């Protein structure tokens, strides 16, 4: 459990560092090519790694092709293209907004489970969601609530970032459909399909 928590922490920290780097890169390349180049390279590395670890049989779809295309599209097309498009359109403030929107993923996951699967969260989860939301608001605004008055000028950008984040949440939840597969196998096949769609 501790190893899993550490893995999640490292992934979150990596994501946080990704947006400042992307801010510089997006001055020279649009979000579509940025996503394609990044995950095209990642897909090749994952294919080699999966082939070495699990062999050719790991590339069999086992009747889950449509699901893999859907979840791959959610992660590697919807998430990557929209979150970087929103960040690019917002300019410098997009770095902070995109980073903080990532912090809302647990809240979004709980809301999706509550609305779609009727899995009502426990009281402590709702309390945690509210605290997380308030914390995110204070970080985004730096305590300056007049920030909300400027949202009308950035609604499209915010919508792109939010939809992108929802896409990633759906992707991670989709891992349950392949629970008998390794994380590497699910990641590789969805990355290949998602990058192809991009």
PLM feature segments, named:
Residues 7-8, 67-72, 98-99, 129, ...:
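Residue-level signature of transmembrane alpha-helical cores of multipass secondary-active transporters
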Residues 9, 63-70, 121-133, 181-191:
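Cytoplasmic-side transmembrane-helix entry/capping segments in multi-pass membrane proteins
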Residues 13-16, 20, 47, 72-77, ...:
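Hydrophobic/small/kink-forming positions within alpha-helical transmembrane segments
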Residues 33-44, 83-120:
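Specific alpha-helical transmembrane segments that line the substrate/conduction pathway
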Residues 46, 106-115, 147-198:
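Transmembrane alpha-helical segments that form core, pore/gating elements
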Residues 46, 121-143, 198:
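Hydrophobic transmembrane alpha-helices of multi-pass small-molecule transport proteins
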């Amino acid at each position: 459990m501790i190893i899993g928590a550490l893995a999640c922490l490292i992934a979150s920290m990596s994501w946080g560092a990704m947006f400042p780097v992307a801010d510089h890169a997006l001055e020279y390349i649009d979000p579509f090519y940025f996503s394609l180049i990044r995950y095209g390279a990642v897909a090749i590395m994952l294919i080699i790694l999966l082939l070495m670890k699990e062999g050719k049989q790991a590339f069999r779809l086992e009747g889950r092709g449509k699901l893999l295309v859907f979840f791959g599209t959610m992660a590697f097309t919807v998430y990557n293209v929209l979150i970087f498009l929103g960040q690019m359109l917002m300019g410098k403030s997009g770095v902070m907004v995109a980073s903080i929107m990532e912090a809302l993923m647990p809240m979004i996951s709980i809301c999706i489970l509550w609305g779609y699967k009727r899995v009502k969260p426990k009281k402590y989860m709702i309390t945690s969601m509210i605290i997380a939301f308030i914390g995110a608001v204070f970080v985004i605004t730096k305590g300056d609530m007049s920030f909300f008055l400027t949202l009308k000028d950035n609604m499209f950008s915010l919508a792109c970032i939010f939809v992108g984040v929802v896409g990633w949440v759906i992707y991670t939840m989709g891992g349950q459909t392949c629970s008998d597969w390794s994380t590497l196998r699910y990641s590789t096949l969805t990355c290949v399909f998602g990058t192809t769609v991009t």
